[in-house]
């Protein structure tokens, strides 16, 4: 009787104990920082840190993926059968153990299925790579909204385009991290296989998706950093052609162009903004590469695409209507301040004009035309570039040093100054014009020194460590 009362008392005590965790799921920021989350719509930890609170309610189930154990059993059965046949002398051609193993594994695995590194990498590492991307890569490649990505990244069923984008995000995140060299190569190979398989699908022409362009942008950057310049150049060319194929620069051609987005109003503007940012990131990549290569641009500045809004409003979900590039260049858009991304676009545009100036000058020299038009165009580009460099960076030095996009924008502007001087050196000028060349040479030397300083400062950012 006494034992019964004791048991009852223990059960009552257990029932009255409160759980250490409140109802609901912890937000992504608290999971990353390993803090106890109060599980409110905007938790106190995120409020104190000044970040947007994101809670992922669709976490994948633990354990092996569906069909994984069945595939392993099939491989084991194939190996056992091959070993029995070899023992009984049924194999006509003698083969080595390695060849036997390769044959058995290839027989049990479908050739069309790409290797998935997530089967070998733990879920915690993959989630860490997502966090690394938004902390170290997103400031330099601001094409994704964090909340929208995490809302679909953990869905059990994803489209092929989104799967390729997620793999590209994790590949580039591993590329900027020095702690996962063994994961980096496997992720890269799998991502390229996924993206190349998308291009072999005829549905690309009828069901285009800009997320495939985003994935190729990230892979091109990874290849410039980790593989080779030529491989990155080829992938960048894919980006430019896909942008043209999907007609992304016409996203703001008319108000009706946004009505084809079959989304709720809260998500529609985010998708439209991501498309704009995808177009402009491809445009900056085009200008930057050709400034080095002295080639011709694939994408033009006449894009019917609004400039990207400031990063803080984009990430926090506060839409702002921005103007067009032509208005910003003319100085007529005073409705909203330009973001560092938009300033980078402006300087890339003016510096990109030196490329067409170079080709026009060469053509006029070959035709024997007078150089007055060349000199007038040269002075106009130089004046415009100098004015925008001074206007875009009338900021405290601390503001520049904390924003990698601003530093990169200034580097593109200095590259335009060097490109102008390179054109001067290859052009036979009239005697009255030669007297101005020392001034341009001094500006070019100053631009070269400034570029070296900017490159050193850029190395201190986490994405380049």
From Swiss-Prot:
Q: Which SUPFAM superfamilies match?
A: Zn2/Cys6 DNA-binding domain
Task: Cite a GO CC annotation.
Answer: nucleus
Principal location listed in the UniProt entry: nucleus
Quote the SMART domains the UniProt record gives: GAL4
Q: Name one GO biological process term.
A: DNA-templated transcription
Task: Identify the keywords attached in UniProt to this record, alphabetized.
Answer: DNA-binding, Metal-binding, Nucleus, Transcription, Transcription regulation, Zinc
Q: Where is the composition biased (Low complexity)?
A: 1-16
Query: Which locations, inside or outside the cell, does it occupy?
Result: Nucleus
DNA-binding positions? 27-53
PROSITE patterns reported for this sequence: ZN2_CY6_FUNGAL_1 (PS00463), ZN2_CY6_FUNGAL_2 (PS50048)
Any keyword Lyase?
no
Specify where the region named Disordered lies, as residue ranges: 1-25
Q: Which GO terms describe its molecular function?
A: DNA binding; DNA-binding transcription factor activity, RNA polymerase II-specific; zinc ion binding
Query: Is the Transcription keyword given for this protein?
Result: yes
Give the protein's function.
Transcription factor that regulates the expression of the gene cluster that mediates the biosynthesis of azaphilones, a class of fungal metabolites characterized by a highly oxygenated pyrano-quinone bicyclic core and exhibiting a broad range of bioactivities.
Q: Under what name is this protein listed?
A: Azaphilone cluster-specific transcription factor azaR
Q: Which organism is it from?
A: Aspergillus niger (strain ATCC 1015 / CBS 113.46 / FGSC A1144 / LSHB Ac4 / NCTC 3858a / NRRL 328 / USDA 3528.7)
Q: Which gene encodes it?
A: azaR
């Amino acid at each position: 009787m006494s034992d019964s009362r004791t048991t009852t008392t223990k059960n009552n005590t257990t029932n009255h104990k409160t759980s250490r965790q409140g109802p609901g799921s912890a937000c992504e920021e608290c999971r990353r920082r390993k803090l106890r989350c109060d599980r409110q719509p905007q938790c106190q930890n995120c409020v104190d840190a000044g970040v947007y609170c994101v809670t992922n309610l669709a976490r994948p189930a633990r354990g092996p993926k569906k069909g994984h154990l069945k595939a392993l059993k099939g491989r084991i059965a194939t190996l056992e059968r091959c070993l029995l046949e070899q023992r009984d002398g049924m194999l006509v051609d003698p083969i080595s153990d390695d060849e036997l193993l390769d044959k058995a594994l290839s027989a049990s695995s479908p050739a069309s299925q790409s290797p998935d590194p997530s089967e070998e990498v733990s879920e915690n590492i993959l989630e860490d790579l997502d966090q690394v991307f938004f902390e170290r890569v997103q400031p330099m490649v601001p094409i994704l909204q964090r909340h929208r990505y995490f809302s679909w990244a953990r869905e059990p069923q994803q489209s092929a385009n989104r799967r390729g984008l997620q793999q590209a995000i994790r590949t580039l995140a591993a590329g900027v991290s020095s702690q996962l060299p063994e994961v980096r190569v496997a992720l890269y190979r799998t991502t390229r296989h996924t993206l190349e398989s998308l291009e072999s699908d005829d549905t690309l022409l009828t069901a285009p998706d800009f997320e495939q362009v985003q994935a190729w942008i990230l892979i091109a950057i990874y290849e410039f950093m980790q593989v080779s310049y030529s491989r990155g150049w080829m992938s960048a060319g894919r980006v430019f052609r896909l942008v043209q194929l999907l007609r992304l620069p016409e996203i703001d051609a008319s108000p009706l162009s946004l009505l084809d987005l079959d989304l709720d109003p809260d998500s529609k503007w985010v998708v439209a903004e991501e498309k704009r940012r995808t177009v402009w990131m491809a445009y900056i990549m085009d200008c930057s590469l050709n400034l080095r290569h002295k080639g011709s641009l694939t994408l033009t500045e006449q894009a019917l695409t609004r400039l990207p809004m400031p990063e803080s409003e984009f990430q926090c979900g506060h839409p702002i209507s921005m103007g067009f590039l032509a208005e910003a260049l003319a100085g007529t858009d005073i409705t909203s301040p330009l973001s560092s991304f938009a300033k980078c676009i402006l300087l890339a545009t003016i510096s990109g004009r030196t490329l067409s100036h170079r080709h026009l000058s060469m053509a006029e020299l070959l035709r024997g035309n007078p150089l007055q038009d060349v000199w007038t165009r040269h002075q106009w580009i130089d004046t415009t570039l100098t004015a925008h460099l001074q206007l875009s960076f009338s900021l405290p030095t601390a503001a520049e040093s904390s924003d990698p996009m601003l530093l990169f924008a200034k580097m593109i502007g200095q590259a335009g100054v060097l490109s102008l001087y390179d054109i001067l050196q290859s052009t036979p000028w009239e005697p009255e014009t030669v007297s101005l060349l020392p001034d341009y040479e001094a500006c070019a030397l100053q631009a070269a020194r400034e570029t070296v300083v900017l490159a050193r400062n850029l190395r201190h950012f986490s994405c380049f460590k």
